[in-house]
Every structure is written in C-alpha cells, then in structure tokens.
C-alpha cells in the first residue's frame, strides 16, 4: 500500500528509525568519545501527542547534527553524571541529557533522557542552545 504524504508526515518513529538515528549520531559523536543512547522514555516521548506537532525523524537528525556541530566539545566537558538540556529554539525541542563514564569502555555515554516540545521550558540544569 502506498502512503499519502499526510500519512507519511504523521507516522510515528519506530525501532528501525531509532536504530538509524543512533547510528547517525554515533558516526558523528564517536570522534568526541561519546556513544549516543536513547532511553525508552525518550523514544516514548518522541511519539507523545502532548508534544503538539509530532517530532519528526528529520527534526531529530537535525537536532543531533546541530548538537554535534555547535555543542559537541561543550558536552565532552561535562563531568561524569553531568546533566544539561539541549534546547533548539526554532522547533521548541528540549532534550535533557546526561553524560555517564563507562569504566570498561573507551567512550562515555551521552544519554538522551526525554524530549518535549515546549516553548518556555525551565530547568535548573545547564542549557545548551543548538
């Protein structure tokens, strides 16, 4: 069955999409010594209708690329357990992240904990504009 543009546009992201996004992110962040990980909660929230407009694959790919280009080195300076919120003002996307050292691995984990589309998101954590 061929999907209409509207069906394609409103389609939820699935496990394959997240696997592709993680591979895309890892290809970029690997040189910074970071392994990008999406939590189950993050994946659930991407498809949450409370975000208003659905968070699209392209938005996530753009967010990851902009994060790498604009803030990759800033993220590497976060301490073990350090938290921050990636904020993309153009799309109102907010992504709380945590950096975790892995003693048995050469890379640290950059854990994307959740995502929400909210204009005036407030946090006590460091905000990183991307």
Predicted features by range, described:
Residues 2-130:
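Ribonuclease/tRNase effector modules and their secretory precursors
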């Amino acid at each position: 069955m061929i999907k209409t543009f509207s069906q394609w546009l409103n389609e939820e992201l699935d496990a394959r999409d997240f696997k592709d996004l993680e591979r895309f992110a890892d290809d970029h962040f690997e040189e910074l010594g970071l392994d990008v990980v999406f939590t189950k909660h993050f994946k659930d929230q991407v498809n949450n209708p409370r975000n208003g407009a659905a968070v699209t694959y392209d938005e996530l790919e753009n967010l990851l690329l902009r994060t790498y280009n604009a803030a990759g080195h800033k993220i590497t300076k976060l301490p073990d357990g350090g938290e921050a919120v990636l904020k993309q003002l153009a799309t109102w996307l907010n992504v709380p992240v945590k950096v975790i050292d892995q003693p048995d691995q050469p890379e640290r984990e950059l854990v994307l904990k959740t995502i929400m589309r909210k204009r005036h998101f407030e946090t006590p954590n460091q905000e990183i504009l991307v």
